[in-house]
Amino acid sequence: MNLNQLEYFCAAVECGSITKAAKKLFVTQPAISGAIRELEKEFSVTLFSHTRSKLSLSADGERFYERAERLLREVETAKMQLHDLGGSRQPVSVGIP
């Protein structure tokens, strides 16, 4: 599992469509489908119940979405904190006798 897979999965959930998620993220539809398929394979679950007109989360998908969304928020928070720390670095001088 990697962050791109989580991002693609969450986008598909939020957009309600793999096609719309692909457009939102500026990637191809097969990239989104493949990422979701890899997640399903890795965890041996079905994340979506596919119907002709709508993409619906399965029970496993709902639980996974909550955690995936939380993980992506945590990663974004960590990035912002590291960025803030990077801007406030002070040089350290070390003297060796």
What annotation goes with each model-predicted range?
Residues 83-97:
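Interdomain hinge and pocket-entrance segments immediately C-terminal to HTH DNA-binding domains
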Residues 40-57, 76-79:
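A short LG(V/I)-centered, amphipathic sequence patch enriched
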Residues 12-26:
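Short helix-boundary/capping micro-motifs
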Residues 42-43, 64-86:
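Alpha-helical linker/hinge and terminal dimerization helices associated
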Residues 2-5, 29, 61:
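The N-cap/first-turn positions of alpha helices
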Residues 17-18, 36, 50:
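Helix-turn-helix DNA-binding elements, focusing on the entry/boundary residues of the two helices
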Residues 8-12, 64:
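Short alpha-helical "packing" element that flanks the helix-turn-helix/winged-helix DNA-binding module
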